[in-house]
């Protein structure tokens, strides 16, 4: 699917056309390719258009609302497995991270793999993430970072969270924040591309 008609629908302030086009694309492509090959590049393109002054903030917000609705519907329509498979994944972002779409894309792909997902939405303090991981008996904590963050702050937050989590709880991190991929962080698994989630889930199942 080409991005131009979708970007035009955003610029024309036509949420119905955008929703219709996205819903059709999802049915035609299947959920995983829809997320990795359409939603992810479209989200990047919208962000770039906003930076370049071609989209207003309200247009970016409208896009986020529409795509959130489409992805939530897709996740809700997945048939639950008779016996839930691991891992159980707790999804969130840390404070100051307002971008929720990355999280939702990850949730859609993990749900498709049969994982049990618990999403706390955005901006959860480190201590609360650790508490929630215990309360929900999470096998994995998955965090999303956009490129708004200072690398030093990201590394410090991740070290703090890793120290508070049980050693048996995996910590997966991803998003467009380049600091996640520049050097290895002990006990933390970076997922640079959404396509890396499926092998990671398979690896987790193989070792548990």
Regions found by a protein language model. Give the residues of each.
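Long amphipathic alpha-helical segments
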Residues: 1-79
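C-terminal regulatory/effector modules of DNA-binding transcriptional regulators
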Residues: 54-56, 62-208
């Amino acid at each position: 699917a080409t991005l131009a008609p979708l970007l035009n629908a955003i610029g024309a302030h036509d949420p119905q056309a955008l929703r219709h086009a996205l819903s059709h694309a999802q049915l035609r492509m299947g959920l995983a390719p829809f997320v990795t090959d359409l939603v992810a590049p479209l989200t990047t393109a919208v962000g770039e258009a906003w930076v370049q002054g071609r989209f207003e903030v309200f247009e970016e917000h409208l896009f986020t609302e529409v795509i959130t609705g489409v992805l939530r519907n897709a996740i809700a329509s997945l048939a639950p497995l008779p016996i839930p498979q691991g891992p159980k994944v707790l999804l969130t972002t840390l404070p100051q991270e307002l971008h929720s779409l990355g999280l939702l894309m990850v949730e859609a792909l993990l749900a498709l793999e049969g994982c049990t997902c618990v999403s706390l939405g955005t901006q959860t303090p480190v201590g609360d993430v650790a508490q929630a991981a215990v309360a929900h008996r999470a096998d994995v904590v998955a965090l999303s970072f956009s490129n708004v963050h200072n690398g030093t702050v990201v590394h410090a937050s991740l070290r703090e969270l890793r120290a508070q989590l049980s050693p048996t709880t995996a910590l997966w991190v991803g998003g467009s924040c380049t600091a996640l991929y520049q050097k290895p962080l002990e006990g933390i698994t970076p997922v640079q591309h959404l396509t890396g989630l499926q092998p990671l889930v398979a690896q987790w199942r193989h070792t548990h």
